[in-house]
Amino acid sequence: MADRSLSLAACTGLIAVVVIGVTVLVAPHFMFPPDGISMFWPTNGIVLGLLLIMPSGIRSRAAFALPPAYVVAELLIGHPVETLVGFTIANSVEILLALWLFSRFGIIDNPLSRLRNLMLVLITVSLCSVLGGLLGALTIATLSEFQSVI
């Protein structure tokens, strides 16, 4: 049991470090002022890939590290609270929805084994990316002092 909790702690820590590191160091280079909207957000793709290669018993519990890690990352970037809350929700929903759809389609443990699975992966991540971006943009438009995105 101790070995399992250690691996859960290691996976959760890895998720938090990657989210904070990539978001703070790489992602701001793709943001457009003044809203902080980004056309390319590498953090979510990297984290989704990490979650997919984790053991299935740990994957869902390690995903609980996403919201706190995004809050810390957004604070380090310097976003206001309204933006921080909206981006945290949008990014977390995007990844959790993709994981749920992968498990619903039955492709979470071996997503690239067949052409059908590959197409489901591409459709799922495209859909989740669009929904996450839309949710983030709507948050900025409604909560931020800058309402230039809509």
Describe the role of every protein-language-model region.
Residues 1-39, 45-148:
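Short helix-perturbing small/polar motifs within transmembrane alpha-helices
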